[in-house]
Amino acid sequence: MTENKKILLIEKQIKVATYDIDFAGIVSNISYIRWLEDLRLAWLEKYFSLGKQIEAGFIPILLETQIEYHHAIRIFDQPVGLMWVSRLHSHKWRVKAEIMVQDKVMASAEQKGVFVDGERMKPIRIPENLKLLYHQEKETTLT
């Protein structure tokens, strides 16, 4: 899944805790989902503040998560999470993520979502400032 163009990339250290480990001694599937949420929140903090979105009257809604587990992560591993925007449509967004240990991709994921009007809870177009940020970085990444 590793791509050359990781637009609006966030990188975050992940701490494996004892409660992340299942009876087989490896990280439980549910922990990966929590880590994706942590990555998405860190991404929002860096690029598109959730607080500012709420103030502007809209919120991001997750529609779908797909994850593929490539290798097991264990208690003393030191994973790093990467997340980036892979695509913006008129109304939908898509992010991809990788959980890595050293240079090895342990899990890869894709999430899809929309922004909704905070009062009506109806989908809205991708906010202009996010589209602008995405396209600016996409252009600089390509050059």
Residue ranges and their predicted role:
Residues M1-V80, L88-T143:
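Terminal targeting signals and extreme-terminal segments of soluble enzymes
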